[in-house]
Amino acid sequence: MDTQPYYKTIIEQIDKHTAYRQECLNLIASENVCSPAVVNILSSDLANRYSVGRPRTRWFPGLQHYDQVEEIAEKLSQKLFHVEYANVQAPTGMVANMAAYLAVLKPNDLVLALRVKHGGHYSHVAENIFKSFNIRVEDLPFDEESYSVDVER
């Protein structure tokens, strides 16, 4: 299947929409307009990096430049808002996961989860926010040789 005509049409429609929006006065508060500088930053590779953790203590390698950007943004935020501490990290999968968990779980419920090193998500671990809600978390038994959940245990 040749997707090029579809791609071309999609790009044309995006360009037309962009031109149209530049001629409008948008009075919908939730539809904020980003400056070209912000659009440039958000379309950079940094926007697609999985940056779990804090600067210099990330769970994944290769984020040294990301760390510097985050540290600068936090210092600017501290100065702008006259505060001693600022966290500029966007809500991520953890926020979505916790919203889902808290919608269906009750105190003392049990969650079985994979550890991060076995492919689980960092929001599934016992050391996380679950403690605040008295939700128990246990590791799924994992066979490191076959790299699979050990259903026999």
What residues fall within each predicted segment?
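Buried hydrophobic packing segments
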Residues: 38, 77, 96-104
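Conserved N-terminal alpha-helix of the aminotransferase class I/II PLP-enzyme fold
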Residues: 50-92
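PLP-dependent aminotransferase-class I/II
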Residues: 123-153
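N-terminal "arm"/small-domain region of PLP-dependent enzymes with the aminotransferase-like
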Residues: 1-57
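Short glycine/serine/threonine-rich phosphate/pyrophosphate-binding segments
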Residues: 94-99, 119-124
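Conserved PLP-anchoring active-site segment centered on the Schiff-base-forming lysine
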Residues: 105-121
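Active-site nucleophile and cofactor-binding loops and adjacent substrate-binding regions
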Residues: 31, 87-94, 115
